[in-house]
Amino acid sequence: MSTIEERVKKIVVEQLGVKEEEVTTSASFVDDLGADSLDTVELVMALEEEFECEIPDEEAEKITSVQQAIDYVKSHVKS
């Protein structure tokens, strides 16, 4: 079983079609990885599916970087 960080990064690579080395914890989905609003919605949906959780819209709007996604999952998902 891979770590939450590895799983989140893998989803970002798959959803945004970026290279793995571009996906650093400080990377912003929009500014650094070129995501648009639809990409970010699809990314949140993929995170929900992978981690079997529901991310409310008001929380999803706050997840704008790889680290924020990792932190959200760590604090809301039972490992």
From Swiss-Prot:
How does it get modified after it is made?
A: 4'-phosphopantetheine is transferred from CoA to a specific serine of apo-ACP by AcpS. This modification is essential for activity because fatty acids are bound in thioester linkage to the sulfhydryl of the prosthetic group.
Has keyword Cytoplasm? yes
Known pathway: Lipid metabolism; fatty acid biosynthesis
Q: Where in the cell is it found?
A: Cytoplasm
UniProt cross-references to PROSITE patterns, sorted A to Z: CARRIER (PS50075), PHOSPHOPANTETHEINE (PS00012)
Which positions carry O-(pantetheine 4'-phosphoryl)serine?
Answer: S37
The record's Gene Ontology biological-process terms are: lipid A biosynthetic process
Which terms does the record give in the GO molecular function aspect? acyl binding; acyl carrier activity
Residues in domain Carrier?
2-77
GO CC terms for this protein?
A: cytosol; membrane
What are the UniProt keywords, alphabetically?
A: Cytoplasm, Fatty acid biosynthesis, Fatty acid metabolism, Lipid biosynthesis, Lipid metabolism, Phosphopantetheine, Phosphoprotein
User: According to its UniProt entry, what is the function of this protein?
Assistant: Carrier of the growing fatty acid chain in fatty acid biosynthesis.
Classification via NCBIfam families: acyl_carrier, PRK00982.1-2, PRK00982.1-3, PRK00982.1-4, PRK00982.1-5
Similarity comment: family membership: Belongs to the acyl carrier protein (ACP) family.
What name goes with this protein? Acyl carrier protein
